[in-house]
Amino acid sequence: MGKYNLILSEYLSFIYNSQSAVQIPIYYSSNSELESRCVEFHSKCLENSKNGLSLKKLFIEYNDVIENATLLSILSYSYDKYNAVERKLVKYARGKPLEADLTVNELDYENNKITSELFPTAEEYTDSLMDPAILTSLSSNLNAVMFWLEKHENDTAEKLKIYKRRLDLFTIVASTVNKYGVPRHNAKYRYEYDVMKDKPYYLVTWANSSIEMLMSVFSHEDYLIARELIVLSYSNRSTLAKLVSSPMSILVALVDINGTFITNEELELEFSNKYVRAIVPDQTFDELKQMLDNMRKAGLVDIPKMIQDWLTDCSIEKFPLMAKIYSWSFHVGFRKQKMLDAALDQLKTEYTEDVDDEMYREYTMLIRDEVVKMLEESVKHDDHLLQDSELARLLSMSSASNGESRQLKFGRKTIFSTKKNMHVMDDMANGRYTPGIIPLVNVDKPIPLGRRDVPGRRTRIIFILPYEYFIAQHAVVEKMLIYAKHTREYAEFYSQSNQLLSYGDVTRFLSNNAMVLYTDVSQWDSSQHNTQPFRKGIIMGLDILANMTNDARVIQTLNLYKQTQINLMDSYVQIPDGNVIKKIQYGAVASGEKQTKAANSIANLALIKTVLSRISNKYSFATKIIRVDGDDNYAVLQFNTEVTKQMVQNVSNDVRETYARMNAKVKALVSTVGIEIAKRYIAGGKIFFRAGINLLNNEKRGQSTQWDQAAVLYSNYIVNRLRGFETDREFIMTKIMQMTSVAITGSLRLFPSERVLTTNSTFKVFDSEDFIIEYGTTDDEVYIQRAFMSLSSQRSGIADEIAASTTFKNYVSKLSEQLLFSKNNIVSRGIALTEKAKLNSYAPISLEKRRAQISALLAMLQKPVTFRSSKITINDILRDIKPFFTISEAHLPIQYQKFMPTLPENVQYIIQCIGSRTYQIEDDGSKSAISRLISKYSVYKPSIEELYKVISLHENEIQLYLISLGIPKIDADTYVGSKIYSQDKYRILESYVYNLLSINYGCYQLFDFNSPDLEKLIRIPFKGKIPAVTFILHLYAKLEIINYAIKNGSWISLFCNYPKSEMIKLWKKMWNITSLRSPYTNANFFQD
């Protein structure tokens, strides 16, 4: 079957290469005769290996199994101690080990000193500044590289060059690691003091990053970039990534636009052959020169030279190399600072009295007016969400930390936990639940902190506020977001848009009389100057709103929100420093409130408006667009004369001067052709994304299993690949093998096969073909899927015990009582299940479930159970459809220009043939009438799964469902009796199927599924009116055609003759599709 199984078997013989090692393949089949041969084959293999006999004869005798059955897993015995890494490493450690320069970084602990110099004793030691936070070890990573190198040492031609480049880079890593010895990890994949004390502190995270980089080397340029980053990041753990990626903000302004895509009135991308010249004042070149000089000062040679060489003609054709450098710079790993430094960073800004009060006033007023505009409709109409705000928040209460560990009693069980949801339950049970009182966060009760680490930036701190803050803010913030959803200015929230829409918006107005101003305001968001005007603006807005209503509950909601702002104006934080906890007055705004994203967007919009209103006193221009996207804002200004160098220079200086008057330390740039913001950058009229997701280092540890992390690793690899950073696929597959193997005993391991890891079951980890999501329809595939479904959900004793306790039961029934007007089992069960699922983030529960999952899996991988699950999956539906399709060759011409140069060839080809899409396909049912009806009267938000279940019930059951949620009987009757209801059935089914087929993930999100070019390849004679069946047939055909094109780079057309008799059967089946959640789908979701 697959390349994976082949590599797996090669990998096993590479790892366990001693005489005592044995590999036993385990096969299965859906054919019962063959299945019994599989079982026989397995038991004989075991017998022979126990008696030390060769397995060769068996392989011949059971050739029918090997030929016709499917590989399930490989069992591997090995009795030699696992110190193989050190032995193998010596072979590669022939170079000179790197010596860290211990003066590069400002903060002493960011220098790569020997651990015992940074932490003299085990008590002082912490791994938090260098923890790779991933459930795989450095020794596994080294093994994976050495396996690849050994496998490819006889390559020829171009492949040989790649081998030599990687070998050369690995020599650096191997020699350095070998000098100190490979650090051994503990059971939790952490590196303890006694392992690290005589080794450089950052050795592990550096080696992981270096391996990730060297396994992504293909060309000579890759090699030069990687070598430089590997060598320098050994010493420079603080500023390297920032230095290397800084020039990009200027580079985007240097490339002429010669043809680009713009958004038209229908919000589609349309080609425009306009020419816009890059107008660049000398000052800009001076700034760039300064950046390149800074790079050279830091020891960089090749990278600045590449940029310098590109500057001679600034062509878009050679720009992908600049994009490559920009992406690579992030792969040096996360910058992890001590919490104290992260907090002080934001407090170091000096206060000056010399600020423009007038501008601050305008800024505050703009914030005030925007808050009013966002909420006035809801307030005037006494929106039910604002009335029942507390209930709404309880339903969406997260299971994140509440900042302190408490002892909680659930029935007979006493546990310690920091989780918000558990604290709420406990407080309710003990009469301590007072959402109407917002706790102070002053010097007596300082805020505990979380952290956010990013490559190339300083560590940022996150407030972990008491849950009362979330309850108080939730409803109001939801309303703000709904407003932002249909306001184009808010690029991040704008309804169903994707980044391509924002791209077309910018390029649309670029011309020889326009310039675009783009600003990175991340410094401003967390600065002290922002905090007073920011919070005051919000408070003033809330005061105005409170006068617009007489509803006591709405006023209460607004007042609680206001109280959170007042409390946070006097905030203190607690920072552990060694074993003392420091309390610091913290005047700035930090993430961690529910409002963070929405409020920052409001503030950033107000900021750029304030600046533009200042600039407009001096210049005459029309503001064509203003956008804010997270920490960035940008605006396109159209002048009535052609733009000149002098104008660009003047506007640029005036803008900077205007920001300076507010003491905002931001990076503001003006260009005529491109922008660069955190999420994307536009150069030469084309769009680029930073491919900067780290694979072998993670930001933080969660409670995900190794399987989950293997799926995330694969998903990250795919995203990087779509964005132009490709890591060797064999290496990724080797990592998946390592991370999905299950230890049975010390010397016994089980490695699942490709079939197990790629079938869409609850255990799916990756796709056997990149970018193509396959839904297996063969007998063996469906058989294994059914078998896995039989053991999907595992129970946890602790969770069951908590769920059985009165504390938990009372909480759930309190929620149900507040929400429901009459009995509604679907909703009550749903709430109980959701609340129980939230318990999973409590470590002991997730551990317990994991153990159960692993033991079930172990049994399964050694012999699949003959279990006939009656559940229907999307596979069954596609399996029914498949036989009625016939394939013929077809031809589609390339008709669109490239606008995303970093895409892999095969994906690019499809977009060039059928076009791209600028919208997300709705896959959550939120557009259906029933969903809108519910949100009109209730704060409850049913999931797409629940809507799918409800909409297929009898009409009177749907009525009862609606009435129980507080929808007036007349509305419920009208709904069920109308045409809208039957449209909804179709619409929700459609959403549900889109959701199951992950149509908004991976590269599918780039393709225009409604392209007429695609439609004309499909011929389905029209029989009878079952829109749902027509829909699934068409969608299946589209996916088939696209998948074929990705794989083969050519097109097919499909003809379907679906018998009318089968249609009704299929339609009935379509209402019973079970959705499958797997590490793979979670990883996709996590990308979101």
UniProtKB/Swiss-Prot annotation:
Principal place of residence: virion
What SUPFAM superfamilies does the database record attribute to this sequence? DNA/RNA polymerases (SSF56672)
Q: Which domain of life is it from?
A: Viruses
Q: Where in the cell is it found?
A: Virion
Extract the PROSITE patterns matched here: RDRP_DSRNA_REO
Q: Which cofactor does it need?
A: Mg(2+)
Q: Which GO terms describe its cellular component?
A: virion component
According to its UniProt record, the EC number is 2.7.7.48
Q: Which reaction does it catalyse?
A: RNA(n) + a ribonucleoside 5'-triphosphate = RNA(n+1) + diphosphate
| Keywords, in A-Z order | Magnesium, Nucleotide-binding, Nucleotidyltransferase, RNA-binding, RNA-directed RNA polymerase, Transferase, Viral RNA replication, Virion
Question: Which InterPro entries would you find in this protein's record?
Answer: DNA/RNA_pol_sf, RNA-dir_pol_4-hel_dom, RNA-dir_pol_luteovirus, RNA-dir_pol_reovirus, Rotavirus_VP1_C
Domain RdRp catalytic, by residue range, is 501-687
Tell me, what is one Gene Ontology molecular-function annotation carried by this entry? RNA binding
Query: Coiled-coil annotation: which residues?
Result: none
Per the record, the GO terms for biological process are: DNA-templated transcription; viral genome replication
* Function of the protein: RNA-directed RNA polymerase that is involved in both transcription and genome replication. Together with VP3 capping enzyme, forms an enzyme complex positioned near the channels situated at each of the five-fold vertices of the core. Following infection, the outermost layer of the virus is lost, leaving a double-layered particle (DLP) made up of the core and VP6 shell. VP1 then catalyzes the transcription of fully conservative plus-strand genomic RNAs that are extruded through the DLP's channels into the cytoplasm where they function as mRNAs for translation of viral proteins.
**Hey, which family's this protein in?**
Belongs to the reoviridae RNA-directed RNA polymerase family.
Listed under subunit, the entry gives: Interacts with VP3 (Potential). Interacts with VP2; this interaction activates VP1. Interacts with NSP5; this interaction is probably necessary for the formation of functional virus factories. Interacts with NSP2; this interaction is weak.
This chain belongs to the protein called RNA-directed RNA polymerase
User: Which organism's genome codes for this protein?
Assistant: Rotavirus A (isolate RVA/Human/United Kingdom/A64/1987/G10P11[14]) (RV-A)
